[in-house]
């Protein structure tokens, strides 16, 4: 965040502290696989994928037939999304949203680059676009007609629980812990990961967690054109619908990077923007001088606020990651302390009494009172819900605030998912790939995204 100055315009540079808001300005890293690699058989279904907590076993690549049959209708995994020329449905919807956008906020333009370089960007200190990366703005001006971002839990002494960057192939230990404690969370899924690791995505949904969008390729959204912003969100929604059968109505911008232009496109897709109030920096351990002890201290800082009166009127929404084995393990270590310090730990839909979390009206998220009574699963219902159930009815004083699979790998150092991906053992990973529809054998073509720092 850049301090306010008297200047009307501010030139942003990549080296400024501003570039390190939220996720430290880190970039998605890529590596070469050094040649083709063949898969053999491993997990066969969701249940078998959920058994092992050995990272090498969990992250063995597999082919999931429903994904291989539809992969050609999606953007290339881990590349910037765009609308294919033959997707007339997407083109028509984008045209409608874009027309509204250009009418309401024509002067809100892209900032910087998709990797977070703002060198030479001129932006007014008055923050006309409510640009979170500039000043952590979460409440657009009234004339935009945009809703405020969700950034706190409105109920007192309540931890809003969510995990970014999933599904991760090595998440079984974390999900086992959540299951054993009847604990639900909001999972912010990357579209490329959903198609890479569909069985892992299915576990999250089937065990009653809320699923939200975290874009297709995890880039700084305010740097992207209107069409690319739309495609990054739209095709992630579509991937989640294709694999899980539900259409999310919530999203979190990578790095927190959002402004009114991006918000308006998201709202055109019925997506509510969710940010956070507290950052554990779990993603940063081992980089930029950040130690594992620093991450533990960050967790402890949030826990300490529960004891000093900070959360008597509301609670935090905390940034955690399903990114690496470490980010998941440190949460597991701190979970008993979190439970002891806070009265409640809930997913975001529950915190805001959003009982219809998806476009599909027969799926219900328990409201706050129901959840704390012990009924925690997001589940199907035979009773149809109308759109009014998505209204925020939180009671805290903070409420006004804001099918089978085949696979394996000869080499345990390589992991990947159903779309033909490979990456590091504990990675939220993906790659460009293709599958032989006759033999079910995948051939890595390259472009791997390893277990890298995503927010």
Swiss-Prot record:
Glycosylated residues, chain numbering: 86, 98, 122, 142, 168, 270, 308, 325, 353, 362, 377, 426
Biotechnology note: Recombinant CDA2 is a potential vaccine candidiate; induces protective immunity in mice against infection. A strain lacking CDA1, CDA2, and CDA3 is a potential vaccine candidate; inoculation with heat-killed CDA1-CDA2-CDA3 knockout cells in mouse induces protective immunity to subsequent virulent fungal infection.
Effect of a null allele: Triple knockout of CDA1, CDA2 and CDA3 results in an absence of cell wall chitosan, melanization of surrounding media, an increase in capsule size, sensitivity to cell wall (sodium dodecyl sulfate), osmotic (NaCl) and heat stress, and avirulence in a mouse intranasal infection model.
Catalyses which reaction(s): [(1->4)-N-acetyl-beta-D-glucosaminyl](n) + n H2O = chitosan + n acetate
Membrane association type: Lipid-anchor; GPI-anchor
UniProt-listed Enzyme Commission number(s): 3.5.1.41
Protein's cellular compartments: Secreted; Secreted, Cell wall; Cell membrane
Region (Disordered): 381-423
Enzyme class: hydrolase
The organism's place on the tree of life at top rank: Eukaryota
Protein name: Chitin deacetylase 2
Organism: Cryptococcus neoformans var. grubii serotype A (strain H99 / ATCC 208821 / CBS 10515 / FGSC 9487) (Filobasidiella neoformans var. grubii)
């Amino acid at each position: 965040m850049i301090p306010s100055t008297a200047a009307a315009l501010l030139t942003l540079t990549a080296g400024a502290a501003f570039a390190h808001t939220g996720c430290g300005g880190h970039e998605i890293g890529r590596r070469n696989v050094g040649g083709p690699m063949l898969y053999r058989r491993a997990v066969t279904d969701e249940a078998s994928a959920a058994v092992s907590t050995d990272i090498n076993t969990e992250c063995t690549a597999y082919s999931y037939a429903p994904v291989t049959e539809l992969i050609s209708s999606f953007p290339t995994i881990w590349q910037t999304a765009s609308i294919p020329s033959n997707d007339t449905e997407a083109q028509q919807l984008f045209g409608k949203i874009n027309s509204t956008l250009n009418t309401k906020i024509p002067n809100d333009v892209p900032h910087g680059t998709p990797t977070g370089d703002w060198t030479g960007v001129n932006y007014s200190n008055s923050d006309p676009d409510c640009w979170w990366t500039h000043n952590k703005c979460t409440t657009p001006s009234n004339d935009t007609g945009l809703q405020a971002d969700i950034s706190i839990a409105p109920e007192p002494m309540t931890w809003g629980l969510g995990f970014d960057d999933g599904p991760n192939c090595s998440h079984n230990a974390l999900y086992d812990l959540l299951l054993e404690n009847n604990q639900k969370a909001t999972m912010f899924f990357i579209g490329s990961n959903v198609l890479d690791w569909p069985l892992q995505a299915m576990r999250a949904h089937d065990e009653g967690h809320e699923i939200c969008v975290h874009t297709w390729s995890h880039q700084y959204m305010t740097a992207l054109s209107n069409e690319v912003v739309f495609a990054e969100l739209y095709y992630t929604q579509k991937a989640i619908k294709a694999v899980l059968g539900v259409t999310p109505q919530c999203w979190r911008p990578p790095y927190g990077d959002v402004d009114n232009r991006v918000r308006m496109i998201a709202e055109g897709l019925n997506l509510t923007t969710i940010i956070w109030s507290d950052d554990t920096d779990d993603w940063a351990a081992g980089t930029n001088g950040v130690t594992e002890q620093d991450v533990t201290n960050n967790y402890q800082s949030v826990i300490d606020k529960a004891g000093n009166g900070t959360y008597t009127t509301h609670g935090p929404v905390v940034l955690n990651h399903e990114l690496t084995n470490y980010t998941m393990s440190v949460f597991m270590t701190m979970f008993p302390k979190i439970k002891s310090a806070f009265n409640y730990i809930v997913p975001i839909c529950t915190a805001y009494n959003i009982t219809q979390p998806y476009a599909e009206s027969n799926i219900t998220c328990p409201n706050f009172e129901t959840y704390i009574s012990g009924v925690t699963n997001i589940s199907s219902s035979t009773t149809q819900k109308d759109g009014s159930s998505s209204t925020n009815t939180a009671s805290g004083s903070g409420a006004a605030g804001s099918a089978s699979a085949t696979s394996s790998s000869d080499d345990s150092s390589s992991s990947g998912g159903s779309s033909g991906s490979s990456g590091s053992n504990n990675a939220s990973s993906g790659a460009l790939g293709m599958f032989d529809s006759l033999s079910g054998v995948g051939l890595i073509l390259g472009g791997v995204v390893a277990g890298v720092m995503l927010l």
